[in-house]
């Protein structure tokens, strides 16, 4: 029986690979000579014979006490001085180790950004699937509808049209809009404030670029865009800290003898510490673990504790030397309901906390009273759109340029007709709709910490339900297998029964780190869409087997030119 030895090659190239050593001695000499040459090394000083005779790799076997498995490492043994110098460079040089670490960190971030773009692209593909299903539904056979569709049925279908991740079926427009912001914030590799990301996401939706959103925003055609409502400096400055499992232990609070104290340090909780205007927030996890910390606007908020994960309750808290003084449900991220708040009250009673003198409503001086604003009209219906100085680098058109071709006019006409169905069943409050302040956590003045009010930042919800049809090329999607109607209805039905706007509640997977939302968002879609998008982003092992198929993200092999290459493919080969 022939034994093969698996070695990981050390390379300065972009991709490391596992290889099985079965080459001839001549090939091994060439490999060693190339590996030991490097930049600045004189190849003539090291002959293949010296390496073959003086440089070898021998395995050392480490046995665990329970003898369940073996762990083998490879120890280099050499006598040649030049080989020793090369190994010392690899194993001991601080500059090389720092460069290697930097390379690994960048590659890790690049993978996270690609996965975030996959979450955006699969969402756009879901729009296309719904379009296809709606066309088939009009022919009755797809959904097996025997009776003529009623106005109520059309109303239900129009709402289903917007059944996206983070967007529910309720008429609470503010909650849906906030859910979109939280979705963007959660999947962003940098976890930039979703309130700020929404402006750039809106610009991306309405521009002509075919690049995926986060690539477009950071290094693509949109990297020069400086939105007047949210400058680049503010976008990068306000990034939300998502705690990992170890980090959040410092914020875990336990209750002993009716007093709140930090579990790790044993220090009694006192919210009077810190600045006079400091605001303290809490979340109660689904496993009934309480976390409390000081809120930092644009950096640390309710979603920080559990990395945007699911909670039982969230809100504001006031504690004086371990004694609970006030608590109320207020979180722009989780939007706690009365049921959530009562769950927290039950938790406190179970831990023998005296609630007799505890305030359950904010004081007016706390600035928590909800402000009322009138909903601004849809920007789609405005005759004069907001001016945007961004011009697409590839096409030369502004995102707000009116469509000048038949296909774009058809898309807009179809989208407007869908929105017009919303008037078929009038609401009681159509004459005047008042909503709470649309800031992430609580209303503030425009000058306070650089945040704007709802009236200044409001973008109509319809602007975000606009499908970016130019993201995909119709003529290269013939090879794609259609999504089964059972899977389409299964996902729609699964979202119909969810009343919460928490992203974690609308997804079936659970997570504990900042990478979790990106993975969970992908898993929420039918497997056909998942594999299709991952293959296009070169994040699926199936991509190599389907390399012969044309893909909007796959590179087109050309000589002497980069035409036809997708953004992700160019980045993969150039970086």
Curated annotation (Swiss-Prot):
It is found in: Cytoplasm; Nucleus. Residues 97-124 form the IQ domain. Residues 425-445 have a biased composition (Acidic residues). Keywords: Cytoplasm, Nucleus. InterPro entries: IQM. Its main location: cytoplasm. Expressed in roots, rosette leaves, stems, flowers and siliques, and at lower levels in cauline leaves. GO terms for cellular component: cytoplasm; nucleus. It comes from the Eukaryota. Residues 359-380, 421-452, 538-575 are annotated as: Disordered. May be involved in biotic and abiotic stress responses. This is IQ domain-containing protein IQM6. It comes from Arabidopsis thaliana (Mouse-ear cress).
């Amino acid at each position: 029986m022939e034994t093969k030895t698996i070695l990981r090659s050390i390379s300065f190239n972009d991709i490391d690979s596992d290889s099985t050593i079965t080459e001839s001695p001549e090939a091994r000499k060439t490999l060693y000579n190339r590996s030991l040459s490097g930049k600045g090394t004189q190849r003539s000083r090291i002959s293949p014979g010296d390496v073959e005779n003086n440089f070898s790799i021998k395995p050392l076997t480490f046995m665990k006490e329970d003898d369940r498995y073996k762990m083998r490492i490879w120890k280099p043994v050499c006598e040649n001085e030049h080989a020793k110098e090369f190994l010392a460079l690899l194993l001991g040089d601080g500059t090389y180790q720092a460069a290697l670490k930097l390379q690994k960190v960048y590659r890790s971030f690049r993978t996270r950004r690609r996965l975030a773009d996959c979450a955006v692209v699969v969402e756009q593909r879901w729009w296309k699937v719904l379009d296809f299903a709606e066309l088939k539904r009009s022919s009755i056979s797809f959904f097996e509808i025997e009776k003529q569709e009623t106005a109520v049925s059309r109303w239900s279908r129009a709402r289903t049209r917007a059944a996206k991740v983070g967007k529910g079926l309720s008429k609470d427009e503010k909650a849906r809009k906030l859910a979109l912001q939280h979705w963007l914030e959660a999947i962003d590799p940098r976890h930039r404030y979703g309130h700020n990301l929404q402006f750039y996401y809106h610009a991306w939706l309405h521009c002509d670029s075919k690049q995926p959103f986060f690539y477009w925003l950071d290094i693509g055609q949109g990297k020069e865009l400086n939105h007047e409502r949210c400058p680049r400096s503010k976008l990068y400055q306000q990034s939300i800290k998502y705690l990992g499992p170890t980090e959040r232990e410092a914020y875990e609070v336990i209750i002993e003898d009716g007093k709140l104290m930090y579990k790790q340090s044993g220090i009694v909780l006192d919210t009077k510490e810190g600045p006079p205007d400091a605001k303290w927030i809490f979340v109660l996890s689904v496993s009934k673990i309480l976390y409390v910390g000081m809120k930092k606007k644009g950096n640390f908020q309710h979603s920080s504790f559990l990395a945007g994960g699911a909670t039982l309750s969230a809100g504001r808290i006031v504690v004086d030397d371990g004694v609970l003084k006030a608590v109320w449900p207020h979180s722009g991220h989780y939007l706690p309901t009365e049921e959530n708040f009562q769950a927290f009250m039950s938790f406190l009673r179970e831990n023998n906390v005296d609630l007799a003198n505890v305030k359950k409503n904010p004081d007016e001086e706390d600035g928590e009273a909800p402000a009322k604003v009138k909903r601004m009209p849809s920007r789609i219906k405005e005759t004069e759109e907001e001016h945007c100085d961004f011009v697409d680098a590839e096409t030369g058109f502004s995102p707000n340029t009116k469509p000048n071709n038949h296909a774009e006019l058809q898309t807009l006409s179809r989208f407007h007709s869908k929105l017009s169905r919303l008037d078929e069943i009038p609401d009681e409050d159509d004459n005047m709709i008042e909503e709470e302040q649309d800031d992430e956590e609580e209303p503030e003045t425009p000058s306070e910490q650089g945040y704007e009010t709802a009236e200044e930042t409001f973008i109509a919800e319809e602007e975000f339900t606009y499908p970016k049809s130019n993201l995909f090329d119709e003529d290269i999607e013939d090879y794609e297998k259609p999504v089964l109607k059972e899977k389409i209805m299964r996902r729609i039905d699964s979202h119909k029964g969810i009343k919460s706007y928490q992203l974690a509640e609308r997804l079936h997977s659970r997570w504990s780190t900042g990478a979790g939302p990106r993975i969970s968002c992908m898993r929420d879609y039918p497997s056909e869409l998942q594999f299709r998008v991952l293959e296009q982003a070169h994040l699926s092992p199936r991509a190599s087997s389907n390399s012969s198929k044309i893909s909007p993200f796959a590179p087109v092999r050309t000589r002497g030119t980069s035409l036809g290459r997708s953004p992700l493919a160019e980045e993969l080969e150039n970086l």
